[in-house]
Amino acid sequence: PQQIPDHEILCAGFPCQPFSQAGHKQGFNDTRGTLFFQIEKIIRCKMPKAFLLENVKGLKGHDKGRTFQIIIDTLEAIGYNVKTKILAAKDFNLPQNRERIYIVGFLNPQHAQKFEFPKALEKTIRYVMGRTSA
């Protein structure tokens, strides 16, 4: 982590296969599932003002929620105020039905308090496509 340049915001994802419906759901027992802890090391070393992590929505319920709770507890123990939400790409006019969990954290509790996840757009991709075809 020391070789990574300092930064104010960390955006990262870790392999989803260990937590995915399509995968074998081995979680932290799958080597790929432990890559979250590499992200944790970077966060601990660099202490960015904020981070954004994303993964499959199945992460939240994996191992009856224990895996997700370990992740949240780990990030909060470092000193971050953490918020999470499942968002669907289709709700933001992207042509795919893909739900992901987003985990955001802020060192400053006031920033966390002000942060709001985006709300679904009212116009659907079907609406947009219908308006552009002639």
Q: Which stretches of residues belong to each language-model region?
A:
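Class I S-adenosyl-L-methionine
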Residues: 2-9, 16-134
